Swiss-Prot record:
GO terms for cellular component: cytoplasm. Homodimer. Keywords: Activator, Cytoplasm, DNA-binding, Stress response, Transcription, Transcription regulation. Affects cell viability at low temperatures. The gene is cspB. The keyword Hydrolase does not apply. It holds the Pfam family CSD. Residues 4-63 form the CSD domain. This is Cold shock protein CspB. It comes from Geobacillus stearothermophilus (Bacillus stearothermophilus).
Amino acid sequence: MQRGKVKWFNNEKGYGFIEVEGGSDVFVHFTAIQGEGFKSLEEGQEVSFEIVQGNRGPQAANVVKL
């Protein structure tokens, strides 16, 4: 599992990016966020996640808010 902070997340469009220290930013889609209810992330929020290969490159999967 990787750890990072949410760089930005657009609730209307349902996606954003996670900053990884010493690495490239990782795309995150709301469907990758674990938990019940409205799936959203806040800027600066710490998360853990896995990196998988998506259609357009690396993206976050199994995102858990810390």
